Amino acid sequence: MAYKVLVVDDSSFFRRRVTDILNKDPKLNVIDVAVNGQEAVDKALLLKPDVITMDIEMPILNGIEAVRKIMAQSPTSILMFSSLTHQGAKATLEALDAGALDFLPKKFSEIAKNSDEAGSLLRQRVVEIARKSEFSKQRTRTRPAAVNISPKSSRLIADQHRPLASTSSLVTKDKKVMAAITRSSGKEYKLLAIGTSTGGPVALQKILVQLEENFPLPIIIVQHMPAAFTAAFASRLNSLCKISIKEAADGDVLKPGCAYLAPGGRQMLISGSENSAKIKILDDDSPKITFKPSVDISFGSAAKTFAGKVLGVILTGMGSDGKEGARMLKAKGATIWSQDEQSCVVYGMPQAIDKAGISELSLSLDSMAASMVKEISRG
């Protein structure tokens, strides 16, 4: 049976085009459309779609408020369409925080000319989050509850259906989560490296808000994200977390307790030595490199600089970026972990390293931060 899709947009042209694109996949069936946020809320409750594609700027009720209402009344997998502007990035991040699972840039020109690439990407994203919706429904009664925290910033609003799990002292009372927390291997670490894609913004926020200001390692983060989004995302994370988080810039010196987010549309490399490592940002126009930034490239450079003194983590994401970079790290003696299938929005990138035998441990998102701290504490 095809996944049911509700298309929400105030543009009649965009509604028709998105509907035509999605209906080309036999796994998808657009069951209805909505022209504003309030209509989306009403139809989500009535029709119970598997996936909703949602515009942000709409009359009567905007996309962000619509997401909040839908997640409160009839939780549904939602894909946001976002403009490639700083303001569009901020709005999209708000929508993700409210409960949306993923986003795509709203490119009218590519949709208008019926680009095969744009259509294929849209169908792929919708199918993937529809599968997540189906998987989540099957696990609803058995999924352990998350543990809430009080974050640094009073501006954080945690969605009640997807609360931010945390342990202010990195200790949780949830027995199921505690069971997954590993004992330290006793290895020495100089760097924490994280790679992610679809579902990454929420996963990263959930992990990073739990880390204390005195976190002993620098952190590099590669999140597949457009160039217009990464500065806004880094700024948002910095406002919520105790550690410092910034969009990486060329020449940045890696410091403990600081996280560096790879800028969208470019590549982030690590150079120097393990005790004086710096970030190098490159403009890469090579058509051979699909992702900009690329987890493989950043992880590979970390392997050259830090050898085995890296804890590398692959979180939720589509595709297999990070597999070769993680393989390079592992060959140098680094520790590689993955996010488990149950807690991923898309179990693609973690699955790639799991199947290749690269990951040493597969952890739930709820237990990831505490496990990281335990591992690097060396007992």
Curated annotation (Swiss-Prot):
Record bears the keyword Hydrolase: yes
Broad class of enzyme this protein falls into: hydrolase
Catalytic residues identified in the record: 197, 224, 321
CDD domains xref list: CheB_Rec, REC_CheB-like
GO cellular component term of the entry, any: cytoplasm
Its EC number(s): 3.1.1.61, 3.5.1.44
Listed name of the protein: Protein-glutamate methylesterase/protein-glutamine glutaminase
Organism for this UniProt entry: Colwellia psychrerythraea (strain 34H / ATCC BAA-681)
Top-level taxonomy: Bacteria, Pseudomonadati, Pseudomonadota, Gammaproteobacteria, Alteromonadales
